[in-house]
């Protein structure tokens, strides 16, 4: 059996090494191309998202105000304070008339209920003028405020309905009293520790009622 000359073995080994180097270079180039393509697409996507975010960011204080309130709700702080005071004065006038003219209005409880309801609505809506309509609407529909909001506006509308349309004196007086409770709760809840005190009083009242009724 004849052996290959050393020169042939060297050439064969050199050819094998060259082929291996070429294969490795091709694989490396393919990996580099795929990495470049992946990085380029990722960079383009990131750049596009950054441009979208930049375009949606407010560039001035006016943009922030427009995002919060529509143009017809935009009032200056002075205008809101003036309207707030006007609403409070209107509510005070209604409550004062109800108090001093109670002997006269007692004979006409439906008119008393309407006047009291008007004062209650002016009192509550005054804070809406001060905070802004959308912000106040979110405040009233918050989880901790929603039960009160539903109770208060339900009693107001029921008082108006029974006083102006159904003309039921007993139900008008009942709804007006419930409305008074809602307004007092609303006013006290904004005092320091007012909400905590109301919860303590309500829980104590419920416990006392359960003790009396043996529930």
UniProtKB/Swiss-Prot annotation:
Major subcellular location class: Golgi
Membrane-crossing residue ranges in chain numbering: 82-102, 112-132, 146-166, 173-193
GO biological process: protein transport; retrograde transport, endosome to Golgi
Membrane topology (UniProt): Multi-pass membrane protein
InterPro entries on file: Vesicle_transpt_Got1/SFT2, Vesicle_transpt_SFT2
Cell wall biogenesis/degradation is among the record's keywords: no
Pfam family for this entry, one: Got1
Null mutant phenotype: Lack of SFT2 is lethal in a strain lacking GOT1.
Post-translational modification N-acetylserine, affected residues: 2
Keyword Transport: yes
GO terms under cellular component: cytosol; Golgi membrane; Golgi trans cisterna
Modified residues (Phosphoserine): 60
Superkingdom as given in the UniProt entry: Eukaryota
Segments in the Lumenal topological domain: 103-111, 167-172
Subcellular location: Golgi apparatus membrane
Residue intervals on the Cytoplasmic side: 2-81, 133-145, 194-215
Keyword tags: Acetylation, Golgi apparatus, Membrane, Phosphoprotein, Protein transport, Transmembrane, Transmembrane helix, Transport
Primary role: Nonessential protein required for the fusion of transport vesicles derived from the endocytic pathway with the Golgi complex. Can be partially replaced by GOT1.
Family, per entry: Belongs to the SFT2 family.
Other facts: Present with 279 molecules/cell in log phase SD medium.
Protein name: Protein transport protein SFT2
Organism in which the protein naturally occurs: Saccharomyces cerevisiae (strain ATCC 204508 / S288c)
Encoding gene (name): SFT2
